[in-house]
A protein has these predicted regions:
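Hydrophobic N-terminal alpha-helices or hydrophobic patches in metabolic proteins across all domains
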Residues: 1-183
């Protein structure tokens, strides 16, 4: 089984989706999906003293501009174990430049999380939560002599547009009309 591909399409929509967690909140290890096997592999350990400020993973059945599944940060009161599916809704998106290329990261919240369930747009987040995420993405690769820049923060509607775009890209590349459409 490869979670990127082997999940029912109806479970992945712009308003409600399963996020696959690769990295728990508070971790310095950068795990990522091995696209061939569907397993997690250790990509690297972060060089800086920063840790992931939120649970980090991807949205299955999506294909982003960087050639990977669409990234997602899942804000939750708890660290979530890697390889866990989390039913989420989007509240915004961080658009960054990473290595000269656009890299979009959806910000999402699990349905029913008692800490974050009252937030529906990124602008509603407490200032510190928001600033901690921005700081992380501005410095997490600095000691590797790589540059990342937060370009723009967008609201829920833009996040849903990006998710739809990445679902459509996935369907165009991987299903070629053979699979069930999500709409």
């Amino acid at each position: 089984m490869n979670i990127w591909h082997d999940i029912a399409p109806e479970r992945i929509t712009a308003k409600s989706f399963e996020a696959f967690i690769e990295i728990p909140k508070g971790c310095k290890a950068k795990y990522e999906l091995d696209k061939d096997t569907g397993l997690l592999k250790l990509d690297r350990v972060l060089y800086t003293s920063t840790v992931y400020p939120a649970n980090y993973g991807f949205i299955p059945r999506t294909f982003a501009d960087d050639g990977d599944p669409l990234d997602v940060l899942v804000l939750c009161g708890e660290s979530i174990y890697p390889q866990t599916l989390v039913h989420c809704y989007p509240i915004g998106v961080i658009k960054m430049i990473d290595g000269g290329s656009l890299d979009e990261k959806i910000i999402a919240i699990p349905f029913g999380d008692p800490t974050y369930h009252s937030y529906y747009d990124i602008q509603e987040l407490p200032k510190h939560v928001f600033e901690e995420m921005m700081h992380f993405f501005e410095v997490y690769k600095s000691l590797e002599h790589k540059t990342t820049t937060v370009k723009e923060i967008c609201h829920r509607d833009e996040a849903m547009d990006i998710i739809n775009k990445c679902i459509d890209a996935y369907e165009g590349i991987f299903t070629s009309g053979k699979g069930k459409k999500r709409r």
